[in-house]
């Protein structure tokens, strides 16, 4: 699905505020990344810039679970 390089980049650099892309073409932004949880929220465009909303679209226990579900850094 995704290249090993992109998966490793996601593991190293995907933190709060990172834009994410899912394998189905959906976009989101990491709202929080803690030791045991990652929360991705929907984004909306304002003045051509993606802005996070309060709508949670995905939650995971860890980065590997998130990547397995198809999310990587954009």
Predicted segments with their positions:
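Terminus-proximal functional modules
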Residues: 1-74
